[in-house]
Amino acid sequence: MFALNSRKVSYKNFWILSGLLVFWSCAQIGSPTGGPRDETPPAVVECDPPNYSTRFDARKIQITFDEYIVLNNVNQELIVSPPMDEKPEVKLRKKSIIIEFEEALRTNTTYTFNFGNAIRDLHEGNVLQNYEYVFSTGDILDSMSVKGSLKYAEDLDVPGEPISVMLYTDLRDSVPLTDIPLYVGRTDDSGIFSVNNLRPDVYKVFALKDGNNNLLFDLPTEEIAFLDTSLIVNADFVKQLLGDSIVTPVRAQLSLPSCCRRRPRE
């Protein structure tokens, strides 16, 4: 194992997590022939149970669209946050996505299903980007969010592939060696990431190039970035920084240090 000391190691293998924003907001709930190409992505017309439900206790979700769709690489694109021990089964039925799972859900927890770039219309391949289905097993929906960007420190290039951004309430540097995160997001083509529907808490933030898609830092070829300071996700903390006059969504920009690929200290 390596202990991180950013003053003594080269920037060659470093990433930068930058521009992090913390905010909260209220949750808001046929193929043409001829003429210009249809560039409109599929639209959701119905969800059962409804999106943004509270006191959720179902084991099956149906999301219906206004046209026939296809799922592209859904096992890799779909992010469930908090992660489930067993990935839910996702299948197509006519114009609907069916999600089924048997795993017991955590109490008083907000879950987010983010489909990334998996949902496309059948005929033109238009992508419905980052569609989210959200529910809470409790009485309220958590609405804090974290947004930011990820770049290589040496040349400020963005990663050439999606990178998992992982949040833990366990603040040990070594936690990604043994535990899956409480919340997870993923960078897009511009290195931008967003992790939504968080509960107020203090988090340790990691970015992982996850070679085997298991949300653990367990392969020698995997790369990781991590912050040596904890991230406070709390509406009252944001108000202290920006004042009560700011309307929602409220944002606070935090400075993040460079982080390296080496294994975090035990």
Give the location of each predicted region.
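Flexible, disordered linker segments and immediate boundary regions flanking tandem C2H2 zinc-finger modules
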Residues: 217-220, 233
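Acidic carboxylate motifs that coordinate Ca2+ or other divalent cations, activating on Asp/Glu
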Residues: 214
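Bacterial Sec-dependent N-terminal signal peptides
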Residues: 1-42
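Short, composition-biased linear "edge" segments at structural boundaries
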Residues: 226-235
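Acidic, low-complexity Ser/Thr/Gly/Pro-rich repeat segments typical of extracellular/periplasmic
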Residues: 26-197, 202-208, 220-226, 249, ...
